[in-house]
Amino acid sequence: MLINDHDLNVERHGSASGPAVILLHHGLGSVASWRAQLPELLDTGFQVIVYDRWGYGRSDGRAALSMPHFSEDIADLLAILDSFEIEQTALVGHSDGGTIALLLAAAEPKRITSLVTIAAHIYLEPKMGPGIETLRGKYQHDARFRDGLRRMHGDKVDAVFYGWYDGWTQPEYVNWDIRPCLPQIECPTLVVQGAADEHATAQHAADIAQGVPAAELWMVPGVGHMVPQEAPEVFTPRLLEFLGNTIASD
């Protein structure tokens, strides 16, 4: 699909008459990141849109990511909604995708029916630095990890990884903080974070939940940053329950 002059790999599943849910992958992810959730969302009757963000997976390559403000990603997401003539949707975003979801829900509150964030970032905190550096070492020295990313991103894999790494390590972003926009979010929101998250403290998740007016916090015991992939057996049922309850009550 041609969106804002670049080609995006966009998949639309289910009936167009079903309630819309958009899945936003994490900073090194792709549509494949949601393979454990997609079938069950479809079985529940949702219309699901999942896509490789610009620069990722089977979408066009990208010279640099618009991090951490994600302005180009937000513009793409709005254009996808408009292309499918979707007036309202639920958003489910993981990590960077969760940040994008928060920013869009704050900017366009009437268009978002329900919001689920998993390990989203709303400011930079000291714990993020060591976690990012650990992943850089893993990418450089762990062939299995690198090959897994290559299967998702192909020849773009270096651009994806170092674009993400560079985006979160720019010194000019040290004071980045989106907490002031969170009160603008109007929809029911589930804030999810693994209790053993390698990139964020429990306070980070609490700050998201405290900032969004209609939010509830779920800390998942014994799970790290990759909640949908590490613990689908507990995450997916809770996701379906939350979306079903909040969209139905809209």
Predicted ranges, named:
Residues A196-A200, H225:
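Acidic catalytic loop of the alpha/beta-hydrolase fold
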Residues T99-A107, I112-R144:
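Flexible "cap/lid" loop of the alpha/beta hydrolase fold
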Residues I185, V191-Q193:
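Short beta-strand/loop motif that positions the catalytic acidic residue
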Residues V50-T89, P237:
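Active-site loop/oxyanion-hole signature of alpha/beta-hydrolase fold enzymes
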Residues T89, G93-S95:
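Conserved alpha/beta-hydrolase "nucleophile elbow" surrounding the catalytic nucleophile
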Residues E216, G222-D250:
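Catalytic active-site module of serine/aspartate enzymes centered on a nucleophile-bearing elbow/loop
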Residues E11-D60:
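Conserved HGGG/HGGXW glycine-rich cap/lid loop of the alpha/beta-hydrolase fold
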Residues W164-C181:
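Active-site nucleophile elbow and catalytic-triad environment of alpha/beta-hydrolase enzymes
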